[in-house]
Amino acid sequence: MAAGGATAAGATVFANRCAVCHGPQAAGIPGSFPSLHEQVVAFAKVPEGRDYLVMVVTTGLMGALKVGGVSYNGVMPAQSGLSEAEIAAVLSYLASDLGRNEAGAPALSAADVSAARARHPDKSAQSTRALRPATES
């Protein structure tokens, strides 16, 4: 898929699945829903971060974490029903800072999503937290 097509597909998945909680610009709501900007871009630049992002979308996420110095302790539901191509598209869209920075992080492919799922077949919303790369916040 061409970069523009991938961005459009990712934007559509984001609008339909993510924006209701994280907001239309992915800024989040402090204390309730984290921003999806800086950390998603940073995570998408490293293999372990890419696996974490794929598994968060696949399994959901439960437990305490900090994003930008703000604490969160909630539940993100698994985004069931998304194809590997849709997961790749939405994560690539987020990793490019909502399509504004194509050089933000490498795009993910459906094959990347499939490989991450194969590496972590037994993850759940609770155990996916352990995949999260260390961050300064």
What are these regions (language model features)?
Residues A6-G10, G49, L53, E86-I87, ...:
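Stable alpha-helical elements in mature extracytoplasmic
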Residues M1-A15, G28, S32, A42-A44:
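Electrostatic cytochrome c docking/interface patches
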